[in-house]
UniProtKB/Swiss-Prot annotation:
This is Uncharacterized protein ZK673.6. Residues 1-27 have a biased composition (Polar residues). It comes from Caenorhabditis elegans. Residues 1-29, 248-284 are annotated as: Disordered. It comes from the Eukaryota.
Amino acid sequence: MSNLPTSTPVSPSNLAEENPKSNNPESSEIEDANFVGKILNKDQFNLNEQFSSDIEWIIKYLDVMQGVTVGLEKMCISGTSYHFSDKTEVPNSGWRYMPAYLKKVEFIKKNEAEANMIAELCEKMGHKEEQHFYDIKNVDHDSNIYTTTVFYCDKIKKMYSDVEKTVKTCNRRRKKVEKTQILPDLRDQCTKYHKAVHTLDEQCRELDNLKEYVRAGRHFHNRHFKQGLVVISALTAVRSGVIKEWMTRDSKRQQKKGKTTTVARSTNKKNKSMMGTVKDLKKK
């Protein structure tokens, strides 16, 4: 595998095949010396530079895309929310909190209608924002930008960290093999060394596969982001529509209120006029 560490040690199993056991003690000592010599001829483990560079690039790419997903959410969801919908897993819009606050306020009777109208429109605005963000977030595709950045970014970082630790473990095991002088200890250390190398090989292979999976999904990430911008544009129109609806309803309410006031004033004037007429009649 091209992206595995630059040097691959000979496994104990292969060495055992190359060095069959002998009942001759002197022969065993020679075989042990050859065994250790083969290991010592191998270089220290180092990750392939291109492999490391590719992984670091993928991590930076996913970090940037995480910023994009956060930006999309902020453009859709107004305010800071601490509640999520159990069904959609979408954060509640800040507009949703306004009706709850308005319910706790005791308005005078003439302002109750206006307060109820504001609460209704705030609830509508919040629902529209959450619905549009749901359309952005829940795209049915394996390379969904939210799934990839949230889940795979942390996973790749952890896997890369594990690989770096395993490289150090392999080099540490190798040094122990170098320093071992007793045959039983040598066999034990070689077994541990072999396991560490096998683990490193598996980790590198899994990390490389995940890297290629994310790389292959970049085209869909770009398309997903563009779709998100289209949804945000539509949401902007919806917000404008809600504001216009509020202005229209408020204007009608003010007109109705003005008519009521005019009628009340007219009635009041008529009553005063009638009272004056009654007083004049009494004087006569």
